[in-house]
Amino acid sequence: MSRLLGIDLGEKRIGLAIADPGGPAMALATFRRGPAPAADAEALRRVIGEQAVTELVVGLPLHASGDEGSQAQLTRAWVEAVQPLIGLPVAFRDERLTSHLAEQRLGPMKRGRSGGPPTRAQREAYRARVDQEAAAIILQDELDARHGGVTTGGPPMGDAPETAP
């Protein structure tokens, strides 16, 4: 059985979601980015092995116009560095507004214990959960597109170049 891993690549964290081809996509985990793509690939390999993943779906941050900017180029470069170390096919998916939608799904961040502003730990936990939810939205969009359904994002962005296993 094949499983898909959705990835929301951020500057500090990587949000993950998992799904069988029939869906639904479910938030899975968030981990801190490593100092280099090879460290990220190692962390992903553990998840891929545990979850029996056969394909990755990576969110591609586009401008509102649909054009690729510097963040999209950085994402593509990261995939080019990580994919040979993982050996799985990668599909790109438009990720515009996924973090905003994830925040709407999760609701506002909880206040601190004293009713004041949230603590640093609470902010970090909330951001990690947002990253997971964004990955789930990216992955669900891809699943919906593959099954002819309506998506919240844009059109599929194509596949990354495949490498020999």
Regions found by a protein language model. Name each.
Residues S2-I7, E11-P165:
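Phosphate- and other anionic-substrate recognition elements at nucleic-acid/protein interfaces
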